[in-house]
Amino acid sequence: MAACHRILLLLSVAVASGAAQKPPLTKRGLLEFGGIITCSTGRSPLSYVMYGCYCGLGGKGWPRDKADCCHEHDCCYGEAETLGCQTKTDQYRWKCEDKKVECDDLNDKCEKFLCKCDRDAAKCLEKAPYNQKYLFWPSFMCGSEEPKCSIY
């Protein structure tokens, strides 16, 4: 579960250093997710580093709203890890066209799976209204009940 949160923290550093500026076709591993968020939503991945109960460091309780998509992303990465994928280091190529992430031509099972995880999470973020009140949401307000990954 904490994988998404570590990813978002690393993304914030990458974005701050200008690493999110990508050529049309990119291969970068862990930092894919930040670029995919920007492609799909037009927002900086920093907007989600401490959003709700799952987007950011840690992760517990019940997601606050539809934009608190990181629990589902954590579950997807967990499934990828059971397939032997290295969610922090495996790389894949993708491109952004008209706010759509394209990575359908990948052949490697881990590349395909990780791209799907990142693309689905970014689509979730794109569709959901961004609620400013959940930025910097305190974890003590998240409760102790958590959804199971099987709900997705």
UniProtKB/Swiss-Prot annotation:
<dbReference type="InterPro" id="IPR001211">
    <property type="entry name" value="PLipase_A2"/>
</dbReference>
<feature type="binding site">
    <location>
        <position position="56"/>
    </location>
    <ligand>
        <name>Ca(2+)</name>
    </ligand>
</feature>
<feature type="disulfide bond">
    <location>
        <begin position="103"/>
        <end position="115"/>
    </location>
</feature>
<keyword id="KW-0479">Metal-binding</keyword>
<protein>
    <recommendedName>
        <fullName>Phospholipase A2</fullName>
        <ecNumber>3.1.1.4</ecNumber>
    </recommendedName>
</protein>
<dbReference type="GO" id="GO:0006644">
    <property type="term" value="P:phospholipid metabolic process"/>
</dbReference>
<dbReference type="GO" id="GO:0005576">
    <property type="term" value="C:extracellular region"/>
</dbReference>
<keyword id="KW-1015">Disulfide bond</keyword>
<dbReference type="GO" id="GO:0047498">
    <property type="term" value="F:calcium-dependent phospholipase A2 activity"/>
</dbReference>
<dbReference type="GO" id="GO:0050482">
    <property type="term" value="P:arachidonate secretion"/>
</dbReference>
<feature type="disulfide bond">
    <location>
        <begin position="85"/>
        <end position="110"/>
    </location>
</feature>
<keyword id="KW-0732">Signal</keyword>
<feature type="binding site">
    <location>
        <position position="74"/>
    </location>
    <ligand>
        <name>Ca(2+)</name>
    </ligand>
</feature>
<feature type="disulfide bond">
    <location>
        <begin position="55"/>
        <end position="70"/>
    </location>
</feature>
<keyword id="KW-0443">Lipid metabolism</keyword>
<dbReference type="GO" id="GO:0005509">
    <property type="term" value="F:calcium ion binding"/>
</dbReference>
<feature type="signal peptide">
    <location>
        <begin position="1"/>
        <end position="20"/>
    </location>
</feature>
<dbReference type="InterPro" id="IPR016090">
    <property type="entry name" value="PLipase_A2_dom"/>
</dbReference>
<comment type="similarity">
    <text>Belongs to the phospholipase A2 family.</text>
</comment>
<keyword id="KW-0964">Secreted</keyword>
<feature type="disulfide bond">
    <location>
        <begin position="53"/>
        <end position="142"/>
    </location>
</feature>
<dbReference type="InterPro" id="IPR036444">
    <property type="entry name" value="PLipase_A2_dom_sf"/>
</dbReference>
<comment type="function">
    <text>PA2 catalyzes the calcium-dependent hydrolysis of the 2-acyl groups in 3-sn-phosphoglycerides.</text>
</comment>
<dbReference type="Pfam" id="PF00068">
    <property type="entry name" value="Phospholip_A2_1"/>
</dbReference>
<feature type="disulfide bond">
    <location>
        <begin position="75"/>
        <end position="149"/>
    </location>
</feature>
<dbReference type="GO" id="GO:0090729">
    <property type="term" value="F:toxin activity"/>
</dbReference>
<feature type="active site">
    <location>
        <position position="118"/>
    </location>
</feature>
<feature type="active site">
    <location>
        <position position="73"/>
    </location>
</feature>
<feature type="disulfide bond">
    <location>
        <begin position="69"/>
        <end position="124"/>
    </location>
</feature>
<keyword id="KW-0442">Lipid degradation</keyword>
<feature type="disulfide bond">
    <location>
        <begin position="76"/>
        <end position="117"/>
    </location>
</feature>
<keyword id="KW-0800">Toxin</keyword>
<dbReference type="InterPro" id="IPR033112">
    <property type="entry name" value="PLipase_A2_Asp_AS"/>
</dbReference>
<dbReference type="GO" id="GO:0005543">
    <property type="term" value="F:phospholipid binding"/>
</dbReference>
<keyword id="KW-0378">Hydrolase</keyword>
<dbReference type="GO" id="GO:0016042">
    <property type="term" value="P:lipid catabolic process"/>
</dbReference>
<feature type="binding site">
    <location>
        <position position="58"/>
    </location>
    <ligand>
        <name>Ca(2+)</name>
    </ligand>
</feature>
<keyword id="KW-0106">Calcium</keyword>
<dbReference type="InterPro" id="IPR033113">
    <property type="entry name" value="PLipase_A2_His_AS"/>
</dbReference>
<feature type="disulfide bond">
    <location>
        <begin position="39"/>
        <end position="96"/>
    </location>
</feature>
